[in-house]
C-alpha cells in the first residue's frame, strides 16, 4: 500500500426559615404508638391539671371582674414558656397543656407570641430547588444564637411591611427579579472547521441559572415576580441581610414612616403580628388630601420633610411618568429618589414606558444623578437606568451619547456595593449592542480591570480569601460584560488581550474557583468563555515576535535545508537530525512555561492543565465544559508548530483523551461541536495514532446514524467525527480494522448516500473520502466482501 494513494487533503482544514421547629411526621407517628394505657393516663393527668388550675384562679383577687395571675406565678408553678427544639426525643404534639406536675413525662409549653423581629414562615422566598435560605431578617440571625435547635426571644420592634424577598412564594416559584440582566443572548455565530467562538449574546436560558447570591438583587425593579426559572442544584448563600429591590425599599420606607407615627404607645402583652404581604408598588401612590392631582414639583420644596413623607405615604396611584421625570430635577433628594424609583418600577418590562421616558428626556436627567452627593439618589438613578436600557437599543445609544459611560466609570469608583452592582449591570446590558462593543472596549477595559476584575479575583495583589455575595455579583456582571465584548471584532479581541491584568484576573479567578470547589459558578462560565473567544484565531492575530518565538526552527525548516547547510556530519535523513525538532520543542516548551503573564496565558502550556481540570471537575454547568473544550480546540487548530506541541501535551502529559470521550458519551449537540472539534485537532497531531485509534474509533462510531429512523447529530458534528476517523485511517491500519469490526462501514455508506440537504452534502462528501481511503487497505478487501460490501460502495458516487 502506497501512502500516496490516500486522500490526505480531502478533509483537512476546518429552601423558608421558621422560628418554630415543628416535629416531623415520623415522630408524631411514633408518639401515637404508645397504646391505650398511655392515652388514658395522659387524659387523667390533664383533667387533674385543669381542676387544680381552676381552684387556683378562684383564690386570686379580681380586677374589674377578671382573674389576673401574679407576675411570677407561672414560673413558680413551673409553667414558663418553653421553646421548641427540632426533632428532640420525647417531643409530642400534645405538649402544649399546662401541668403542675414537674415529674410529668413532657414539658408544658404555652403558645409562643410572635415578634416582628423573629423569623416567620414568610421570612424567606421558597427556593427549594436551589436550597436557598435567607440568612438574616431585620438584624436577626437566621438560626439564632442556639442555631436551628430553638427560637431565641427577641425584643419587640415596630412593624414594617414584609418585602417581596421575604414573602413565601406559591409552590417553589423562583425570584424573577432579574430582568435587567437578561440582555445577553448568545446566539450561534460563524465557525470554521477548526476554530471555536462563543457568539455574541447570551441566550435567556443561559442567564437564568445564576448562583443564588446573584439572585439576591439582580434586577433594579421590584414590582414583578414570576416562576419557572432553572435554578442550580445545591447552591450556597453566604450570610447576609435579606435584600429588597430599591424601588420597593424606598416606597416601603415612606409607608413605614407614616405608619409608625400612627401607632399608639406600647400595650403590655400585645402581640405584633407580621404583615403577611407587602403592599404592591401601585398601592403606594402619591396623592394629596386636598387635591385630586399632583402639584408642581417646586411646590413640594415649601413642605417640611416630615409633612412631605406623610403625604408621600398615602399611595402611588396618582403619579405618572411625566411627573416622575420632573421629580428628577427637584432640589429635594427625597423627590429625586421617588422619581427615579417610579421610573425604575414603570420601565421594568414596559416597552412603551421606556420609549415615553426617553421622549421625556429621562436619560440625560438620570445621567446627571449618577454622581449625586446623596448616595440613595445615585442608587435609584442607576437602578432606573438599568431597567430603562434593557432590551432597548435607542435608550442605550441615548445613554452613550449623554456621556453616560464616563459618568458610570466615575460612579464605579464609589465603595458602595449597590452602586457597583448597578453600574456593572448597566455595562453588561450595553455590551449586547453590536455597534457599541468597540467603543465600550476602548473606554472601559482598563478601569474595569483595575477597579473590579483584579481586586475581586485576587490577581496582582494579596490573595482574595472569599468574595461576599455582593462582590460575587459585581464580578459576575463584569465577566458577563467581557463575554459579550470578546465576541466582537478582531480589533476588540486584540485590545482585550493587550489590556494589562485582564487575562491574569480571569485565569486567577478560575484557579481560585477550582481550588474552592466552585467551578459550577456562572462567573467561571463567563471567564472561560472570554478566554475561549480570545483564543479564536490566536496564531493569526498574536504579535509577530511572540509567534516567531513559538515557531522556532521546526521540522519543516530542517527537512528542507540543503545538505551543505547541515551542521556536522549528519544528513537530513539521519535519526540524529530527526530528533532535533523534538529537542527544539522541549526547549521552547520550557521557555514558554515560565511565569506567563497577560496574553501569554492564552498559549501557555499551563492553560492546557487548567482547561483539563475544568473538563474533569465541572459536572453540572455544560456551558463551562463546552467553553473549555472550545478554548482547547482554538489553541490546537491549524498547521502551526505550537498547535502541535499543545496537542501532544494534552494527549501525553494531561491524558485528556479519556475525559473527552466520557463527555462525548453524554454530551448534547452544543457540547459535541466543541468536543469533536478538539478531538479532530488532536488526531492530526498525535504521535501514536495506533493507540489513539484503539481508544477513539468505537466511541465515535456510536454517534453516527445508520438508518433513517436513527437520531443524528448536526452535520458539523458528523463532519468532525468523520475527519477524526480519516486522520486515523490514513496512518493506522488498526483504525481501518476497527471501522469494519464496529459496523462503521454500514453507517458511513448510509451517510454517503444521504444527500437531501446542503448540510448532508458536506457529511456525504466527507464519508466518500473516508471510504475511498479505506479501500486502499488491500489486506481488508476479503473482509469487506465477507461483510457483503463491494468496490462500488467504497469508490462509487
Curated annotation (Swiss-Prot):
<feature type="region of interest" description="Required for interaction with SFN">
    <location>
        <begin position="283"/>
        <end position="288"/>
    </location>
</feature>
<dbReference type="GO" id="GO:0002934">
    <property type="term" value="P:desmosome organization"/>
</dbReference>
<comment type="subunit">
    <text>Found in a complex composed of CDH1, RAP1A and PKP3; PKP3 acts as a scaffold protein within the complex, the complex is required for CDH1 localization to mature desmosome cell junctions. Interacts with FXR1; the interaction facilitates the binding of PKP3 to PKP2 mRNA. Interacts (via ARM repeats) with GSK3B; the interaction may be involved in PKP3 protein degradation. Interacts with hyperphosphorylated and hypophosphorylated RB1; the interaction inhibits RB1 interaction with and repression of the transcription factor E2F1, potentially via sequestering RB1 to the cytoplasm.</text>
</comment>
<feature type="repeat" description="ARM 6">
    <location>
        <begin position="596"/>
        <end position="637"/>
    </location>
</feature>
<dbReference type="GO" id="GO:0050839">
    <property type="term" value="F:cell adhesion molecule binding"/>
</dbReference>
<dbReference type="GO" id="GO:0090136">
    <property type="term" value="P:epithelial cell-cell adhesion"/>
</dbReference>
<feature type="modified residue" description="Phosphothreonine">
    <location>
        <position position="250"/>
    </location>
</feature>
<dbReference type="GO" id="GO:0005634">
    <property type="term" value="C:nucleus"/>
</dbReference>
<feature type="repeat" description="ARM 7">
    <location>
        <begin position="645"/>
        <end position="684"/>
    </location>
</feature>
<dbReference type="GO" id="GO:0098641">
    <property type="term" value="F:cadherin binding involved in cell-cell adhesion"/>
</dbReference>
<keyword id="KW-0472">Membrane</keyword>
<dbReference type="GO" id="GO:0022409">
    <property type="term" value="P:positive regulation of cell-cell adhesion"/>
</dbReference>
<dbReference type="GO" id="GO:0045294">
    <property type="term" value="F:alpha-catenin binding"/>
</dbReference>
<dbReference type="GO" id="GO:0098609">
    <property type="term" value="P:cell-cell adhesion"/>
</dbReference>
<feature type="region of interest" description="Disordered">
    <location>
        <begin position="56"/>
        <end position="82"/>
    </location>
</feature>
<dbReference type="GO" id="GO:0030036">
    <property type="term" value="P:actin cytoskeleton organization"/>
</dbReference>
<feature type="modified residue" description="Phosphoserine">
    <location>
        <position position="238"/>
    </location>
</feature>
<dbReference type="GO" id="GO:0030057">
    <property type="term" value="C:desmosome"/>
</dbReference>
<keyword id="KW-0488">Methylation</keyword>
<feature type="site" description="Interacts with SFN">
    <location>
        <position position="285"/>
    </location>
</feature>
<keyword id="KW-0965">Cell junction</keyword>
<feature type="repeat" description="ARM 1">
    <location>
        <begin position="305"/>
        <end position="348"/>
    </location>
</feature>
<dbReference type="GO" id="GO:0002718">
    <property type="term" value="P:regulation of cytokine production involved in immune response"/>
</dbReference>
<feature type="modified residue" description="Omega-N-methylarginine">
    <location>
        <position position="261"/>
    </location>
</feature>
<protein>
    <recommendedName>
        <fullName>Plakophilin-3</fullName>
    </recommendedName>
</protein>
<dbReference type="GO" id="GO:0010669">
    <property type="term" value="P:epithelial structure maintenance"/>
</dbReference>
<feature type="repeat" description="ARM 8">
    <location>
        <begin position="689"/>
        <end position="730"/>
    </location>
</feature>
<dbReference type="GO" id="GO:0030054">
    <property type="term" value="C:cell junction"/>
</dbReference>
<dbReference type="GO" id="GO:0005886">
    <property type="term" value="C:plasma membrane"/>
</dbReference>
<keyword id="KW-0677">Repeat</keyword>
<dbReference type="GO" id="GO:0005911">
    <property type="term" value="C:cell-cell junction"/>
</dbReference>
<dbReference type="GO" id="GO:0002159">
    <property type="term" value="P:desmosome assembly"/>
</dbReference>
<dbReference type="GO" id="GO:0051797">
    <property type="term" value="P:regulation of hair follicle development"/>
</dbReference>
<feature type="region of interest" description="Required for interaction with GSK3B">
    <location>
        <begin position="294"/>
        <end position="724"/>
    </location>
</feature>
<feature type="modified residue" description="Phosphoserine">
    <location>
        <position position="183"/>
    </location>
</feature>
<dbReference type="GO" id="GO:1903829">
    <property type="term" value="P:positive regulation of protein localization"/>
</dbReference>
<comment type="function">
    <text>A component of desmosome cell-cell junctions which are required for positive regulation of cellular adhesion. Required for the localization of DSG2, DSP and PKP2 to mature desmosome junctions. May also play a role in the maintenance of DSG3 protein abundance in keratinocytes. Required for the formation of DSP-containing desmosome precursors in the cytoplasm during desmosome assembly. Also regulates the accumulation of CDH1 to mature desmosome junctions, via cAMP-dependent signaling and its interaction with activated RAP1A.</text>
</comment>
<feature type="modified residue" description="Phosphoserine">
    <location>
        <position position="314"/>
    </location>
</feature>
<dbReference type="InterPro" id="IPR000225">
    <property type="entry name" value="Armadillo"/>
</dbReference>
<comment type="similarity">
    <text>Belongs to the beta-catenin family.</text>
</comment>
<dbReference type="GO" id="GO:0045785">
    <property type="term" value="P:positive regulation of cell adhesion"/>
</dbReference>
<dbReference type="GO" id="GO:0005654">
    <property type="term" value="C:nucleoplasm"/>
</dbReference>
